[in-house]
Amino acid sequence: MKSKLKLHGFNNLTKTLSFNIYDICYAETPEDQQAYVRYIDEEYDAQRLTQILTDVVDIIGANVLNIARQDYDPQGASVTILISEQPVEPTESQIEESPGPLPETILAHLDKSHITVHTYPEIHPVDGLATFRVDIDVSTCGVISPLKALNYLIHQFDSDIVTVDYRVRGFTRDVEGRKHFIDHEINSIQKYLSADTRAAYQMTDVNVYQENMFHTKMLLKDFDLDNYLFGDATLNLSVEQRKQVEKRLRHEMLEIFYARNMPH
């Protein structure tokens, strides 16, 4: 383990992980489209999201100060958790550049500042394409990196497309008064993903190292059409219809991945 940086007072660095997760599907009829929205609304209601974020608090090592949660009408949910740091010495595994735990290996450790999640179900008015977006922000103040929560969160949602941003702001001083604008090594957000996750996604990085800003976009490689069909009406699609639906879905996913409208 590298020698620890001796600080003058508290570590004042703020580390923020922001990411958007998209789940795409095709629902042919208006009835199936509304059923999809209801399904998502029930599957990821405020109570379920609270449990997921509480697990994140354990992963990054935090204490819960307050939880505010809300289910919205007609759809969507939000949860905000305020968290605080304990005076506990971080372990090497909590600060090194490596993947965080998977859902089945969660261990509670120590803690930080706030976590928020918002959900956005959406349906295309004509094409039958339905999108479920989850926006999550994990902001910590101190030595622990919120990137440790990334691996777990991707496995908690049906993630077809993921956009991740990580930035470090502020500075902290060592005992000699020298400023430090980042306190850990990082070359890519991808280093915090497990091997199976890296293998499953096509990934692109845009990093601004001198500004301590890191960006990774992820697109699921494997495409099985049956995993994207929702509702009874999709059970009897003809071969030609299946080809058309697959074309629409792939086009939708590429537009979201590249964040721009593309010609058909």
Swiss-Prot record:
Residues bearing the modification Pyruvic acid (Ser): S113
Keyword annotations: Autocatalytic cleavage, Decarboxylase, Lyase, Polyamine biosynthesis, Pyruvate, S-adenosyl-L-methionine, Schiff base, Spermidine biosynthesis, Zymogen
GO biological process: spermidine biosynthetic process
Catalytic activity: S-adenosyl-L-methionine + H(+) = S-adenosyl 3-(methylsulfanyl)propylamine + CO2
Site (described: Cleavage (non-hydrolytic)): K112, S113
Enzyme class: lyase
Pfam family, one: AdoMet_dc
Bound cofactor: record note: Binds 1 pyruvoyl group covalently per subunit.
A Gene Ontology molecular function term of the record: adenosylmethionine decarboxylase activity
Alphabetical list of InterPro entries matching this protein: AdoMetDC_fam_prok, S-AdoMet_deCO2ase_bac, S-AdoMet_deCO2ase_core
Family: Belongs to the prokaryotic AdoMetDC family. Type 2 subfamily.
Function: Catalyzes the decarboxylation of S-adenosylmethionine to S-adenosylmethioninamine (dcAdoMet), the propylamine donor required for the synthesis of the polyamines spermine and spermidine from the diamine putrescine.
Cited HAMAP family: AdoMetDC_2
Protein name: S-adenosylmethionine decarboxylase proenzyme
Source taxonomy: Bacteria, Pseudomonadati, Pseudomonadota, Gammaproteobacteria, Pseudomonadales
Gene that this sequence comes from: speD
